[in-house]
Amino acid sequence: GIFEGDRYFDILVEYAKFSPEQIAVRITATNRGGEAAPLNIIPTMWFRNTWSWGQTPLPEPTISAAQGPAGTLCMVADDGETLSDRRIPNSHRLGRRWLIGSTKDAGAEMLFTNNETNAPVVFHPGGTSLSRYTKDGFHRLLCAGEKAAVNPDLTGTKAGLNYSFVVPAGGSVSVLLLF
């Protein structure tokens, strides 16, 4: 079975209210197996896709790379230029939100794509996606090595910080974030 030989990771996610508008997050992964094993931890932020509904698409929110404190990677999400969708009761905007990740103990890279369906994969091979960069972009990059699956311009409606580790047997790694 899946737990045979303890070849799995325990993942602990801790949240602490840092201030009225900020949450500190620590993600700790422990390798329960008897051998070192690779692990990618990808804290992700995305906007719910309501802009492509209906006949007339609405303006899209954006997530982009931003300058953060030394020793961090930073991205900013902003829906301030979007329009409220009347089809959603109590529709609201979040304004600007930042995701800041420490790079002190681990290197990381920012990944960007769009929260759009990969139509040829989901619907049929001749389908056309609404965006060149689709929501499965991180998977396509990490599992198939498809570098063109993520946006090199570091912008999109879905983004993540990719922390790549080789975790020793019985060892742990942690990722520190501020949201």
Each predicted region: which residue ranges?
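Hydrophobic residues positioned within well-ordered beta-strands of beta-sheet architectures
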Residues: 9-11, 25, 41-43, 161-163, ...
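Intrinsically disordered or highly flexible coil/loop and linker segments, enriched in small
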Residues: 20-21, 51, 172
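Extended, loop-rich substrate-binding clefts of extracytoplasmic carbohydrate-active enzymes
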Residues: 1-21, 134-161
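Short Pro-Gly-centered flexible turn/kink motifs
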Residues: 165-179
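Short, structured patches in soluble enzyme cores that scaffold and shape functional sites
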Residues: 13-17, 29-31, 179
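Polysaccharide-binding surfaces and accessory modules of carbohydrate-active proteins
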Residues: 24, 29-134
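Hydrophobic beta-strand core residues of beta-sandwich domains
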Residues: 3, 17-18, 31-35, 167-169
